[in-house]
Amino acid sequence: PLPPYLNRETESSDYETYQTVYSEKKGAVAAPTAGLHFTERVLQKLQEAGFKQDFLTLHVGAGTFQPIKVENIVEHRMHNEQIVFSRKNLQTLVQHEGPIIPVGTTSMRALESLYWFGVKLGKGDSEFFIEKLYPYQHTEILPSRQESFAIILKFMESNGIEELTGETEIFIFPGYQFKVCRGIVTN
């Protein structure tokens, strides 16, 4: 569906035109709207300016557009979203030294969730599901971004995994300590 703020019904042409230029796989409930503004030309200019790019598979859930209707933000129900990372994605993240700035909140949630999966793996838990409040429940000394991603990469290599699929309901609200992202590009 289209986001509610467009105030119109879905048209058949939306299935082709309401997509990012880099969309490859089907499965999302909605398009990741922050990426809709990027054209092939804009992506090329960013690359020429020295910005490194990598692409994730995001299956945006209906909850993306769900308003918060509770007084206590912790009580807000988050929908699970499926996220997929390739071994190449992990290799890129492990080797990257600079800031990571995702396009859109779904990408941000995916990257932050990936970090927390590395934390879980380091503790012997290989279930790739990040509960809504998991990050707020862990204040112990935590691994760096690269250490967490290296744990995941080693797990993938040891188990012959080319593509890692998980689910997240991570909820980022004031007080969250970012482990991966240092900014965001969004609309």
Task: Label every model-predicted segment.
Residues 1-187:
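Surface-exposed, charge/polar-rich loops and edge strands
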